[in-house]
């Protein structure tokens, strides 16, 4: 579905047409805006994504889509995925999300603690309110750090799983992909709890009152 919409949008877009100015403003920054696959199922969103690409990138994308579709038509019945392929798909999707979960939890804990010890004491906000503000800081940081995490995952040398077009569309592939993301986030969030090791319990600092 997404590939068909992309092909139609690429065919309707002239290769040398300039990118609209408002899209340039949307893409200012170190990394381009991240587009999720499910966001490309609507024609307008797909067209906006295609318009944001440079002519060279648009040509490469069109060529790759046409090659993919031709392989799909030429290939017969898809061979079953092996256990090694499923493990690699899971690992390939888990590694980037370990970084996402780690940064999200670590920044939230560190920021929430500092907010509680500074602004929280001044304004008298609760611990949950400080945690919510820490989560806000973590989400804002994630907007800028997501691209760097993806770039680091690519530098680790993990190649895209070598699958046929029909194997890509198998339900086993999608399940392994989602499981890898879930496991990666879980591991990353657990590792991201490390700031708690450096936070002393405030209750231990308070002098204990002698019971009468």
UniProtKB/Swiss-Prot annotation:
Record topology, Cytoplasmic segments: 1-88, 138-139, 200-212
Database matches in InterPro entries: TMEM65 (IPR019537)
Topological relation to the membrane, as annotated: Multi-pass membrane protein
Subcellular location: Cell membrane; Mitochondrion inner membrane
Main location: membrane
Disruption phenotype: Morpholino knockdown of the protein causes pericardial edema and altered cardiac morphology in 4 days post-fertilization (dpf) embryos and severity increases as embryos age. Morrphants are not viable by 7 dpf. Hearts showed abnormal cardiac looping in the morphants and a significant decline in heart beat rates seen in after 4.5 dpf and continue decreasing at 5 and 6 dpf. Ventricles show a significant reduction in amplitude of Ca(2+) transients in morphants between 4 and 6 dpf.
Extracellular side: 110-116, 161-178
Segments passing through the bilayer: 89-109, 117-137, 140-160, 179-199
GO terms for cellular component: mitochondrial inner membrane; mitochondrion; plasma membrane
Gene Ontology BP term (one): heart development
Organs and tissues of expression: Expression is restricted to the heart (at protein level).
Source organism, top-level taxon: Eukaryota
Chloroplast recorded as keyword: no
Keywords: Cell membrane, Membrane, Mitochondrion, Mitochondrion inner membrane, Transmembrane, Transmembrane helix
Function: Essential for maintaining proper cardiac intercalated disk (ICD) structure and function. May regulate cardiac conduction and the function of the gap junction protein GJA1. May contribute to the stability and proper localization of GJA1 to cardiac intercalated disk thereby regulating gap junction communication. Regulates mitochondrial respiration and mitochondrial DNA copy number maintenance.
Subunit description: Monomer. Homodimer. Interacts with GJA1.
Protein name as it appears in the record: Transmembrane protein 65
Organism the protein comes from: Danio rerio
